[in-house]
């Protein structure tokens, strides 16, 4: 007598999706990294610097610096990265705003743990000051508040 176990058959696919998900979400270009702590086994702790372009507004690029946990767990993708990051966004060409811009729209995210924790970047438009404002935050609550950083891009004539 054979039993049909659909969950057991689907387990490899589910695990593959779980581990591939964070890699697919990361749309940044690596700029550089600095090793911050030596680990005898596995990769060192480091700070990564990554760049990404705003997917809806041409002419804006952002640089995100964030810690990456090393060691055995970090090397296997099982460690949780610290929740802080810094952000710097700049105008890199002419900016034309779309007719409708959603306040707080997500422009970038990267997984910082095996499950549930992410570093996100969202965009706002400050019409009064004619500037795009980018906010990065971790989705993990730390000491009663979320770790965050902000960067503003004044929209200037180009050329």
Locations of the language-model features?
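Bacterial N-terminal signal peptides that target proteins for export
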Residues: 1-12
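N-terminal secretory signal peptides
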Residues: 27-88
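Short, low-complexity Ser/Thr-rich regulatory SLiMs
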Residues: 51-53, 125, 138
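Mature extracytoplasmic domains of secretory-pathway proteins
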Residues: 61-125
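N-terminal signal peptide c-region/cleavage motif recognized by signal peptidases
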Residues: 20-22
């Amino acid at each position: 007598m054979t039993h049909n176990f659909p969950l057991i058959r689907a387990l490899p696919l589910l695990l593959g999706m779980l581990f591939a998900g964070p890699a697919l979400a990361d749309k940044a270009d690596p700029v550089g990294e600095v090793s911050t702590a030596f680990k005898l086994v596995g990769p060192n702790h480091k700070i990564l610097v990554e760049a990404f372009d705003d997917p809806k507004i041409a002419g804006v690029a952002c640089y995100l610096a964030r810690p990456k946990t090393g060691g055995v767990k970090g090397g296997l993708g099982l460690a949780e990265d610290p929740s802080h990051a810094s952000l710097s966004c700049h105008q890199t060409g002419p900016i034309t705003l779309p007719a409708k811009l959603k306040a707080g729209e997500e422009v970038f995210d990267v997984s910082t743990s095996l499950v549930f924790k992410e570093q996100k970047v969202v965009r706002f438009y400050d019409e009064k000051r004619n500037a795009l404002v980018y906010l990065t935050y971790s989705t993990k609550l730390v000491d009663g508040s979320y770790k965050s950083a902000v960067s503003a891009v004044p929209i200037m004539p180009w050329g």
